[in-house]
Amino acid sequence: MLLTEEDKQFIAEEERLLESTLQSLCQQLPQVQAAKISANAAARELTRQVVNEWNHEERQPLVSDEAVAHHILDIRKNSDKALYELIQEPYFGRVCTKEEDGSEVSFLIGKKSNIEAGIVDWRNGPIAGLYFNYKQEEEFYEVINERERAGYIQLRRSYQIENGQLVQIDAPEGMFRRNEAGWERLDVEDEIVAHRSRGMGSKEKRLPNILSLITKDQFELITSNPERPVIIQGSAGSGKTTVALHRLAWLLHEENSFAQAKNTRVVVMNKSLQIYVCATLPSMGIEGVETSTFNGWALSIIRKAVRGRPFFKFLNVPSFVEEIKFSEEILKALEGWVEKQNRALDAQVKEIFKKWPGLLKSWTKTNNTAVLPRLKDFAHDVKESSLPKYDKDQCLAFLNRKSFDMEDYVQDVYNLLHDSGHLKGYLPPNPKLDSHLDYLKRLTEKNRAKNNLDYFDMSLVLRLIQLKNGGLPDGTGGVTSLDHLVIDEAQDFGPVEFAIMMSAVSDKRQITIVGDVAQKILSARKFIGWNKVVENLGMEEDSIIRLEVSFRCTAPIMTLAHKVAGDPKKVEGRAGPDPEWHKAEDRESLLEKLVDWTHSLVKADPYKLIALICRYPKQAMELKEELKEYLPGEVRLGHRDQFSFEPGIMVTNIHQVKGLEFDSVALIEPDEENYPIRREESRNMIYVGITRTQDDLLLTTVKPFSRVFFYN
């Protein structure tokens, strides 16, 4: 739509505001850089003095001064970095208030604060709340800096600024967007498109910034109470992970909570999502937080806690084996197994130490302590006791043997899975249970003989370590007690993994959980269910954050996704091309279609990130090799840590793309063979594949399409 003179004046005013803000930030640079150089010189000089000072009494105050100087240098370095980041994107919102006494105050809302430029960090709850909690012309009442403030919101606007340039303004007066020809006023449908926070031609491929789109209720849940667990449900592309990470960013900001970045963790389902999230965290002001896959985290602990080097192998096993190992019953069987060992140990200790009532009393009073620290503490008591040397040596040898046996977690898992009688006491009745347990017993014998472990055994080993140590060992003799934990794609974790993660936090309220059951693709891992999660956390169900609007996908794509998910309905949202269905005559024509399709997309926008998604990793590798002839040097493989989110064409498989997003997606061979309708996860896997795209979707196959597309 053409701009009126009033529109032009409106935009010019906003451009002047940005220019003056950038000018203020740039004027601060020389001062900050000079302070950094000065701090660096001071730190180096003090280090030189410490090195050259041999007198201990003279050296001590120098050491203290040096530590302070280096801390100041770190602050100066961060100030320098923060300024450069603000110059790229100084703010995303503005709010002006008129208070009851007639005074007017204006704030810019950004990802970081800068007092001189008038920018307030969005994590500064009371002030930022004026932007998030109110609309233009609404009355407000807030307590800010221990002072009651009331009035009304005179002005509220949202912005998109990229590389120091204003590209979008969203206000009650209308939405305006900059294009190659200049500024334009958007109509209603184009406004929906513009709410995507990544514009056309953007090289930035990471989780989008949705801060300006967060609702009042969502802001309240994210920022109001650091002691409350947060659960976020939502459809694909609705910003679940982004909202969760903003919750974490708020918790880590200054004095919003006690959480420290170094003692906080984000756990995701796959390696590619880990890379994606790691690339996003710095842009949200989150530094020093460990992001890992669950298996990566588990392995890092297991390799330190387990003797030797356990070898976990992907084994092709019947689904009932996987279901047993990821069931809620196996979790109880593990606890029962450790309890049985504890009872046997307790009986032995009582028999051996009955001659020494004082030591036996010392053992008995630690009855509620986990077995390994209990043995360690008791061994210390025995060592410090007045027992005769021979008796003391014999008792300590016994306790050391018991500790050694208790720490043999791998043999423990073998023994547990081999003990059909024990398992039968926990698993639900089933006509085939005996034959299933016989098979599991034989499989375990083979694994023990080869010193192999199934990848599905990893969680069992880790849970045993946790139960016997009273927590996950932290490598320094203590146990992990996280300040906060974010769990993404929660629906694909089973009861054992959930128990491990929930027990790893200092307080079960210090947790943020994200998920969508429609995207569950690991069917054997039975999700404990949102009702149980809510119950375990002591929450009310109505306190769950639900995000229903997809900011990623177009309406035609989400309409197809809902149909695949078994919930057919017409979806409102931004417009876009219909999904393209291509039934190829043979493999060669399928490849030719992919080449033509990708070429047309890249020609229209050379910065597009295009994903060609196969069902299995082997299929992805084969497709990449086939496309080499047609697209030499243009196609790369996306697999685990080989993922790159630079623009271009990526071939990958469905399990790698959970939680990710691309500009365009081609689903390769979504046929009945790859996605049989009889398998529960087929529907969810196709849903995941479809909803990875922002704009373009191609479905291409030689064989008939999977019946999942046509039957609810």
Q: Model segments located where?
A:
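Generic detector of solvent-exposed, compositionally biased contiguous segments
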Residues: 54-75, 220-235, 239-250, 396-444, ...
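Conserved helicase motor core of SF1/SF2 NTP-dependent helicases
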Residues: 257-258, 262, 271-275, 279, ...
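Short, charged/polar micro-motifs that form catalytic or ligand-binding hotspots
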Residues: 81, 85, 200, 204, ...
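Alpha-helical nucleic-acid-binding subdomain
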Residues: 128, 133, 252-487, 491-509, ...
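Extended, charged low-complexity regulatory segments
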Residues: 1-211, 215, 219-220, 706-707
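Conserved acidic
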Residues: 206, 436, 681
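Phosphate/oxyanion-binding active-site loops and adjacent basic polyanion-contact surfaces
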Residues: 206, 210, 240-244, 453-457, ...
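P-loop NTPase Walker
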Residues: 1-35, 40-41, 169, 175, ...
